[in-house]
């Protein structure tokens, strides 16, 4: 698998970067936010991601390796495709995204057009699992869903529940989180 290409950037259109290396031309989809970093008619280092959908290869070029790695995590989440991954990466910097994922700020993801509560939670859970080894158990998911139905904010619930002991029963977990939520809301 290719990590990056260091090639001559001879053309940029509204969808693709076009690079030449050793008399071969390469075409990569790119983030609009990366455009300011690429230098036309110069050699550029472009980090590569490949996504295969129904035997069709799509190639993506990124200016930053960490952003590329985050993109690869996002497109491997069920129901999250290229457009949603690009939407997330276009609207927040890498550091902002790490903060959002680390602290479970679903409200920030929900601000993006077309992303609902379920998808935002799925994204946060998946990225936390991948980057920070945080796993939300089925038990914790039940408590989160119940408290959301009662009107509590998902981000507040996550801040509390992420560090709670797994040995608690659902009732004990719910009681503990409700108690902590009462301090946040007062």
UniProtKB/Swiss-Prot annotation:
The entry's keywords: Cytoplasm, DNA damage, DNA recombination, DNA repair, DNA-binding
Which parts of the sequence are annotated with region: Domain III?
137-186
Q: Where is this region: Flexible linker?
A: 137
The entry lists its GO molecular-function terms as: DNA helicase activity; four-way junction DNA binding
User: Which SUPFAM superfamilies does this entry report, sorted A to Z?
Assistant: Nucleic acid-binding proteins, RuvA domain 2-like
What is the protein's quaternary organization? Homotetramer. Forms an RuvA(8)-RuvB(12)-Holliday junction (HJ) complex. HJ DNA is sandwiched between 2 RuvA tetramers; dsDNA enters through RuvA and exits via RuvB. An RuvB hexamer assembles on each DNA strand where it exits the tetramer. Each RuvB hexamer is contacted by two RuvA subunits (via domain III) on 2 adjacent RuvB subunits; this complex drives branch migration. In the full resolvosome a probable DNA-RuvA(4)-RuvB(12)-RuvC(2) complex forms which resolves the HJ.
Name used for this protein in its record: Holliday junction branch migration complex subunit RuvA
Question: What taxonomic ancestry is recorded?
Answer: Bacteria, Bacillati, Mycoplasmatota, Mollicutes, Mycoplasmataceae
